[in-house]
Curated annotation (Swiss-Prot):
Keyword Hydrolase found: no
Signal sequence extent: 1-29
Highest classification ranks of the organism: Eukaryota, Metazoa, Ecdysozoa, Arthropoda, Hexapoda
Residues that coordinate or bind butan-1-ol: 81, 86
PANTHER family, sorted: GENERAL ODORANT-BINDING PROTEIN 19A, GENERAL ODORANT-BINDING PROTEIN LUSH
Protein name: General odorant-binding protein lush
Residues where 1-propanol binds: 81, 86
Gene (name only): lush
SUPFAM superfamilies given in the database record: Insect pheromone/odorant-binding proteins
Length: 153
């Protein structure tokens, strides 16, 4: 478990460093191209840890949660959210932190939809006991409240 934590921390640090390089001026918002690149980087950091089908990951990418998730897929969503710093190890979503990070995580054209989704889904995790399912169901809620604009690593 400690090895996974160290590896996760290292991957997260690399992702943050690349994002800093992509956004040299903190006052400049992330472009859609940079956003898509960051999704790919996060996916490459989390996906190898789980037994996942590329087709399932591609469906999540476009907000399609209309298929039965495997435990690995649900835990993949937790890995992604841990990397983003929006959940804790118990799968509890931190809406204030997510709202504060939105300007650094999404391009301006997705900002309003993202805020709306965070507000609508802030307590979704409380309906579930298992940590991976908590995060998966929160991500699914985001998708359902995103007016067709949702994207996931």
């Amino acid at each position: 478990m400690k090895h996974w934590k160290r590896r996760s921390s290292a991957v997260f640090a690399i992702v943050l460093q690349v994002l800093v390089l992509l956004l040299p001026d903190p006052a400049v918002a992330m472009t859609m191209e940079q956003f898509l690149t960051s999704l790919d980087m996060i996916r490459s950091g989390c996906a190898p840890k789980f037994k996942l089908k590329t087709e399932d990951l591609d469906r999540l990418r476009v907000g399609d949660f209309n298929f039965p998730p495997s435990q690995d897929l649900m835990c993949y969503t937790k890995c992604v959210s841990l990397m983003a710093g929006t959940v804790n190890k118990k799968g509890e979503f931190n809406a204030p932190k997510a709202l504060a990070q939105l300007p650094h995580l999404v391009p301006p054209e997705m900002m309003e939809m993202s805020r709306k989704s965070v507000e609508a889904c802030r307590d979704t995790h409380k309906q579930f006991k298992e940590s991976c399912e908590r995060v998966y169901q929160t991500a699914k809620c985001f998708s359902e409240n995103a007016d067709g604009q949702f994207m996931w690593p």
